[in-house]
């Protein structure tokens, strides 16, 4: 076998790939022959090259142009040399006067004038700008020994504090009592006059006792009506009587005021004073009760403006009554101070014997619908609101105070519970999708099915709107989209099949 194999190796071609099937690509195959048309013949290239004649006209023109340029340069040099010789002859004849004139003309001729330079850099040479220079020891000693010399143009008075015109204004303090007296002249009754003149001596001891009683009653009202801070940052004023229940389960009774007068449509400037030393109250805003008191008379009480500095810096006070009146079936929404721009309508009603059924109210001006929470639009929502626990009602009040309606908040609370953050996220997403033009019912379906993916919610809403326009039922559309994971083609086929089957 070995000899036979060797013999084949030496005496003939032998391939190990014989009888082995394999496939060769098209690019390795021999290309097909191309048939030339009849009578086609290639010209003889050598003959064509021999017959070609080149005239070298461009090269000859380039040589001529170079010769012309050289002749022009030689003529210019010859003219310059002749002019220099003529100037030298004139200088030798004129003597030193001619030399000075020529030198002056040379230095001041526009051709030889140096270009303009910045005066700051005029004394510097460009090569020596970055070259370090040694400081002479004598100059150093002189600097050390000699006192610092002030320049003539330096005046220390320029840097001293000049008289500020606002300093005089700060020294002029405002007499708060006098300002209030000027504002309330002709509109206030005995109570404000007694309050403002409480520090002045009285001859009658009975009037002094009456002043002290008035001040004590107002201070008690200040303490009783101090805002109650909620954990969520809102402040709600306490309620009056037993016809309204407070959100924090506390009731306040106001001591009777002997004489009260009518104060209407007053706006007061902001007066800065120390609360510890001043007993003057600033009348800033009012609140009213929409339910009647036990005696049948309606009172609008003055709200003291003494607040803690931290609360003033916060700026997010909420003024108003509790959000729900369960006994009388009426609702008084809480209003934030930011929602009442420059509103200082003060109304103090005198005690009158009016029927219990009639109760006058004070309506604030310039309130928009978005600023004041509205009543539940349907009786079912109102019944649901009454059935809530105190904590759930407190949660609803908090979200409603932010501007949402009771219906939306109750629906969101059913889906998200009492977590305010989740309720706000749900309401925000719902509002955004509704603003884009989608049906609120479809938006609720999308939020229920795809809570975490905004992209899937948008796709789901677009497909639902499209299939709804085609005439399919919402129930079938929802089932099909949920089954096929928002696949439009498969969902459409399934809907068509269901429509044909029905």
From Swiss-Prot:
Domain UMA: 17-63
Localization per record: Cytoplasm, Cytosol; Endosome
Stretches the record annotates as Disordered: 77-120, 135-156
Domain UBA, chain residue ranges per copy: 389-430, 451-498
Modified residue annotations for Phosphoserine: 146, 205, 289
Domain of life the protein comes from: Eukaryota
Region feature Interaction with ESCRT-I, mapped onto this chain: 1-95
One Gene Ontology molecular-function label: ubiquitin binding
Coiled coil: none
Annotated stretches, region: Interaction with PTPN23: 260-290
Any one of the GO CC terms: plasma membrane
Keywords: Cytoplasm, Endosome, Phosphoprotein, Protein transport, Repeat, Transport
PANTHER family: LD44032P, UBIQUITIN-ASSOCIATED PROTEIN 1
Name of the molecule in the record: Ubiquitin-associated protein 1
Native species: Rattus norvegicus (Rat)
Gene that encodes it: Ubap1
